[in-house]
Amino acid sequence: MCSSDLATSALRTAYRNRLLGIVADDLTSPDPYQHVETVGRRMSDLADAALDAALLIARRAVGPPARDTALAVIAMGKTGARELNYISDVDVVYVVAPAEGRQVPEEELLAAGTAIATELAAVVSSTGAEPPLWPLDTGLRPEGKDGALVRTLASHVAYYQRWASLDRKSVV
């Protein structure tokens, strides 16, 4: 087992341990309906923390190209609204930029960002020693599943200014 596999298993185990705490609080709540928003927020915060950890694991797995690349993982949908539930997938959009103080050709930047994003998806969603956390959905990105997995901020802005429908603009 390589170090990223060990880190992935550790992340998944830690996630499930914290999820069990949320479940226990949920099941013992005197008024479960009053508790729904709290559960959604806590689960979304846990997913955000898992994405942060998965990003670190992914960056390490990608290696040197990741050093010059900053990748933002933007939570969308129920995760972004802090309304995650027990059966939700996690919607994300990726924005890539050169790491601070670095100058990277856009083609290399996009390749490194895509490698990191692909590895991040494997960390949270692929089969392994520990079960996956949840499906990671990148379909809310510009042009949906037909669009680039990773874009620069300028590319996102240009898309939304030119092509986005009103419902997509309201998401941003």
Where are the regions that the model predicts?
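A nucleotide- and high-energy phosphate-metabolite-utilizing enzyme signature
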Residues: 4-172
